[in-house]
Amino acid sequence: MDTKMEDVGKTPEPIRFQTTTEPASISTLDGWIENLMACKQLPEVDVLRLCEKAREVLHSESNVQPVKCPVTVCGDIHGQFHDLMELFRIGGPNPDTNYLFMGDYVDRGYYSVETVTLLVALKIRYPQRITILRGNHESRQITQVYGFYDECLRKYGNANVWKYFTNLFDFLPLTALIENQIFCLHGGLSPSIDTLDNIKSLDRIQEVPHEGPMCDLLWSDPDDRCGWGISPRGAGYTFGQDISEAFNHNNGLTLVARAHQLVMEGYNWSQDRNVVTIFSAPNYCYRCGNQAAIMEIDEHLKYTFLQFDPCPRAGEPMVTRRTPDYFL
């Protein structure tokens, strides 16, 4: 979401884990999912098992992961677990509904641990029914500043769960392609990328770089001005309608669907409908007053937007933020 690269410090070294635990059975996974749906966190040892299995599943996926219709496309969640439950109520439960999430599962909301653990568990349990992409907040650097690291310390008493998940984030696909026509990603386009094959050739299994094509895919934004521009975020670029039109034409696409920006109605068309922004965290940061939306795409590639408001809040935890919130 609205994050600036200058807010983060030096990139820590990725932590690599050897598989030392027994794989989870389907019945075990179902038990985990049942608890997670009730907003109950898993024990640390089970989070490790979950992340080890998820790494195997995600490693087999492409940088441009193919997705079939029907599918429901979702934007930022940002740890707003109870609003994720409302999303599933509106859109239908997984696996009955196929889902594509475009990143930013953690930070800012109070339930990043439960949110990302549930989505990863669903990915393992129903790998063909849910696609989870990487957002700019699925990063060691960003999560140390915007909440996920502190939440893991608070809920587990150490940083191990944060390490397990941030190691896993390196394996998340960067983009998805729905029926070879709708291109989905978290941020936006890159001056270093002309074709989808350019994306397929990237080495994604790393911390998000400060610059370059992988960074741009997770950080860039559409803009009213033509051409490429310097992003006020300090990472990625802004891109104009001429850029998105050419990219869609050259790659046989009908649409770029992306997240990354707060839009007050939950979705927003731009650049002569070459780009749509989807944001799925209602009343973002518990104070912005925005609606959220998801995009349902049927078997004929027809899309419908479902908007929803935040679910009622009750008993939010008392959390002291280390850093002030900001908005672009």
Swiss-Prot record:
Binds 2 manganese ions per subunit. Its EC number is 3.1.3.16. One of its GO terms (molecular function) is protein serine/threonine phosphatase activity. The modification Leucine methyl ester is found at L328. Keywords: Hydrolase, Manganese, Metal-binding, Methylation, Protein phosphatase. Mn(2+) 2 binds at D104, N136, H186, H260. SUPFAM superfamilies: Metallo-dependent phosphatases. InterPro entries: Calcineurin-like_PHP_ApaH, Metallo-depent_PP-like, PPA2-like, Ser/Thr-sp_prot-phosphatase. Its cofactor is Mn(2+). It catalyses: O-phospho-L-seryl-[protein] + H2O = L-seryl-[protein] + phosphate; O-phospho-L-threonyl-[protein] + H2O = L-threonyl-[protein] + phosphate. SMART domains: PP2Ac. Mn(2+) 1 binds at D76, H78, D104. The active site is at H137 (proton donor). Belongs to the PPP phosphatase family. PP-2A subfamily. This is Serine/threonine-protein phosphatase PP2A-2 catalytic subunit.
